[in-house]
Amino acid sequence: MQVLNSLRSAKARHPDCQIVRRKGRLYVICKTNPRFKAVQGRKKRK
């Protein structure tokens, strides 16, 4: 899964990609091609 600053280009990679909000984060999921998964807004580790 990629961590990206913006998911704007990530949602256009494949026609089946969807943007989903879970627990305050935005995810791109793609069931037909799972390598296109991405997340935006992850916590930084200290």
From Swiss-Prot:
Any Pfam family: Ribosomal_L36
Cellular component, GO, one term: ribonucleoprotein complex
Coiled-coil regions listed: none
GO BP term, pick one: translation
Gene Ontology MF term list: structural constituent of ribosome
SUPFAM superfamilies assigned to the protein according to its UniProt record, in alphabetical order: Ribosomal protein L36 (SSF57840)
Keywords of this entry: Ribonucleoprotein, Ribosomal protein
Membership in a protein family: Belongs to the bacterial ribosomal protein bL36 family.
PANTHER family: 50S RIBOSOMAL PROTEIN L36 2, LARGE RIBOSOMAL SUBUNIT PROTEIN BL36B
Protein name: Large ribosomal subunit protein bL36B
Organism per entry: Cronobacter sakazakii (strain ATCC BAA-894) (Enterobacter sakazakii)
Species classification: Bacteria, Pseudomonadati, Pseudomonadota, Gammaproteobacteria, Enterobacterales
This protein's encoding gene: rpmJ2
